[in-house]
Amino acid sequence: MRCGPLYQFLWLWPYLSYVEAVPIRKVQDDTKTLIKTIVTRINDISHTQSVSSKQRVTGLDFIPGLHPLLSLSKMDQTLAIYQQILTSLPSRNVVQISNDLENLRDLLHLLAASKSCPLPQVRALESLESLGVVLEASLYSTEVVALSRLQGSLQDMLRQLDLSPGC
C-alpha cells in the first residue's frame, strides 16, 4: 500500500490550514487610500475644476449626484454607474480612473462580505441607454460633469467609511 501522497498531504496540512485572513481594518484602509488616489487623479485633470459637483446640467441627470448617507450597496451601485460612463468616454484621461473604480468596487465587496452582506451584481442601467446620444451632443461636458460628480461622491464615500456604513 502506497501512502506517499497521504503523508505529504499530512505533512503540509499545518501550513495549508494556517491561512491568515486579511484584517478588515487593512481592507478599509486600502479602500480609503484608493479613494484618495482617484480623487488626486481627478484633480490632476485640469478641466474638472470648472464645474461644481452640485451644478445641474440639462441632459446629464443620469450622472449620480451627492448622497449624504451611503450604504455599501449604494456605494457599489454609484461606482458601477460612473464606471459605465467613464468606459464610454473616448478620453485617455479616464482609463486609469475607470480601472481604479473596478478595484474600489472589489474592495467594497470585501467590506460587505466581512459584514455578511454580499452586494448584488449591478447590471447595465437603463438610464445609460441614452448615453451615446448625450456623448455625441456634449462629449466634453459629460466628461467634466461626470468627473466632478465622481469626485464629490468619492469624498462622501470617504466620510461614510469612517462611520462604518451598513449593507
UniProtKB/Swiss-Prot annotation:
SS bond partners: C117-C167
Species this chain originates from: Bubalus bubalis (Domestic water buffalo)
Q: Which residues form the signal peptide?
A: 1-21
What Gene Ontology terms describe what this protein does at the molecular function level?
A: hormone activity; peptide hormone receptor binding
Keyword tags: Disulfide bond, Obesity, Secreted, Signal
Q: Which domain of life is it from?
A: Eukaryota
List where in the cell it is found.
Secreted
GO terms under cellular component? extracellular space
Instruction: Give a yes or no for keyword Glycosyltransferase in this entry.
Output: no
Mind telling me which InterPro entries this protein's record contains? Answer: 4_helix_cytokine-like_core, Leptin
Q: What is the designated name of this protein? A: Leptin
SUPFAM superfamilies according to UniProt: 4-helical cytokines
